UniProtKB/Swiss-Prot annotation:
GO terms for molecular function: cytidine transmembrane transporter activity; nucleoside:proton symporter activity; uridine transmembrane transporter activity. InterPro entries: C_nuclsd_transpt, C_nuclsd_transpt_met_bac, CNT_C_dom, CNT_N_dom, Gate_dom. The chain crosses the membrane at residues 4-24, 37-57, 87-107, 169-189, 193-213, 251-271, 282-302, 342-362, 379-399. Nucleoside transport protein that can transport adenosine, uridine, thymidine, cytidine and deoxycytidine. Shows weak activity with inosine and xanthosine. Transport is driven by a proton motive force. Does not transport guanosine, deoxyguanosine, hypoxanthine or uracil. Also shows activity with the chemotherapeutic drugs 3'-azido-3'-deoxythymidine (AZT), 2',3'- dideoxycytidine (ddC) and 2'-deoxy-2',2'-difluorocytidine (gemcitabine). It catalyses: adenosine(in) + H(+)(in) = adenosine(out) + H(+)(out); uridine(in) + H(+)(in) = uridine(out) + H(+)(out); thymidine(in) + H(+)(in) = thymidine(out) + H(+)(out); cytidine(in) + H(+)(in) = cytidine(out) + H(+)(out). GO terms for biological process: nucleoside transmembrane transport. Pfam families: Gate (PF07670), Nucleos_tra2_C (PF07662), Nucleos_tra2_N (PF01773). Transport is inhibited by the proton uncoupler dinitrophenol. Inhibited by the nucleoside antibiotic showdomycin. The gene is nupC. Belongs to the concentrative nucleoside transporter (CNT) (TC 2.A.41) family. This is Nucleoside permease NupC. Residues 25-36, 108-168, 214-250, 303-341, 400 are periplasmic. It comes from Escherichia coli (strain K12).
Length: 400
């Protein structure tokens, strides 16, 4: 009963926070919101509680385990005994496999398997979310291709997309993650929470956006043609491009981690020193924990653990999900399984401030005017995407 009450409270909080920034409350279609919510709760139960769902998750994680094993073969060849001895563990074991996974995605894209999957799942989503096919295709392609390369598939129509639809596309990209780094997440979190979050975020995105950014799509706007990302390229040209793109992602993540972890350590020391003058000695992350404490509690985290979880939530928002996942690993043994599951689901998304620049830059490279539009609603993007993570984690809490 306590879980149900927490869930109802979480729904109310998410709804109120979404309605506060809604562009047009009169256009909200409650039927689709309820429809999506029911489907999402059922999917959460399926993936986190049912034998069939857990079996699927196990099979999915075992597949990624094998892929990571293949990736290690390449890493071992280049770095040799460093990998076997556990040296530079995070870069070699977590980030380097991104190169191999990226290459696989490129192959599946080149042989036209991924476009078929994107269109099939997108078509089904469009039947239940009350939005257009473009939004539904974009949700699936964002999950597979990532928040920056995803927009290349729509480069020919970006200039024709309305402001409302542009917000939906950008928010969807920020609320999901790229399949190329799912393997990296699975080395840091329990695989079942990663898989559940991938599915839940897709539905939570449409629920939150139905409240924040409601609109109707005209029939004339539905003639969408996705571009072939690598038209005219040979197989090996494409493969080389995806391998280099994967390595670039690994290097960027490594650089971001170095910078953010160092910055947070400096801020922790500064805040501890300043607050120490008043006899408290509270770190920067400790202060953020107090700010996010009520949100963590509303999501269903036990009050005794909400401060720790709130601190990790805030760390993810101001830095990125990798920094937050590393912090979670340090305290995971002190958390209850319920709290660990809730925060794990929350962390699996790109909802943070640095993503504003990534998405705006990607769009601006294809269409400068639309890139400026995305930049202008950057803070609203992070706000909406964070609500998506809160909703997904709250739904997971209901069935954990």
């Amino acid at each position: 009963m306590d879980r149900v009450l927490h869930f109802v409270l979480a729904l109310a909080v998410v709804a109120i926070l979404a309605l506060l920034v809604s562009s047009d409350r009169k256009k909200i279609r409650i039927r689709y919101v309820i429809q999506l919510l029911v489907i999402e709760v059922l999917l959460a139960w399926f993936f986190l509680n049912s034998d069939v769902g857990l079996g699927f998750v196990k099979g999915f994680s075992e597949m990624f385990e094998k892929l990571l094993g293949f990736a290690n073969e390449g890493t071992n060849f280049v770095f040799g005994s460093m990998n076997d001895q556990g040296l530079a563990f995070f870069f070699l074991k977590v980030l380097c496999p991104i190169v191999f996974i990226s290459a696989l995605i490129g192959i599946l894209q080149h042989i036209r398997v991924l476009p078929v999957i994107i269109r099939a799942i997108g078509f089904l989503l469009s039947k239940v979310n009350g939005m257009g096919k473009l939004e539904s295709f974009n949700a699936v392609s964002s999950l597979i291709l990532g928040q920056s390369e995803n927009f290349i598939a729509y480069k020919d129509i970006l200039g024709k997309i309305s402001r409302n639809r542009m917000y939906t596309m950008a928010a969807t990209a920020m609320s999901t993650v790229s399949m190329s780094i799912v393997g990296a997440y699975m080395t840091m979190l329990e695989p079942k929470y990663v898989v559940a979050a991938l599915v839940l975020n897709m539905f939570s995105t449409f629920i939150v956006l139905s409240l924040i950014n409601p609109y109707r799509v005209d029939a004339s706007e539905e003639n969408i043609q996705m571009s072939n990302l690598h038209e005219g390229q040979s197989f090996f040209e494409m493969l080389g491009e995806y391998i280099l793109a994967g390595f670039k992602v690994a290097i960027i993540v490594a650089a971001m981690l170095i910078g953010f972890i160092a910055l947070i350590a400096a801020l922790n020391a500064l805040f501890a020193t300043v607050t120490g003058w008043f006899g408290y000695s509270i770190s920067f992350q400790g202060i953020l924990g107090y700010i996010f404490y009520p949100i963590a509690w509303v999501m269903g985290v036990p009050s005794s653990e909400a401060l720790q979880v709130g601190s990790i939530m805030a760390t993810k928002l101001v830095s990125n999900e990798f920094v937050a996942m590393m912090d979670l690993q340090k305290i995971a043994s002190t958390l209850s399984p319920r709290a660990e599951g809730i925060i794990s689901v929350f962390l699996v998304s790109f909802a943070n401030f640095s993503s504003i620049g990534i998405i705006a830059g990607a769009v601006k490279g294809l269409n400068e005017e639309q890139g400026n539009v995305v930049s202008r609603f950057g803070l609203k993007l992070v706000y909406g995407s964070t609500l998506v993570s809160v909703l997904s984690a709250s739904i997971a809490a209901l069935v954990l």
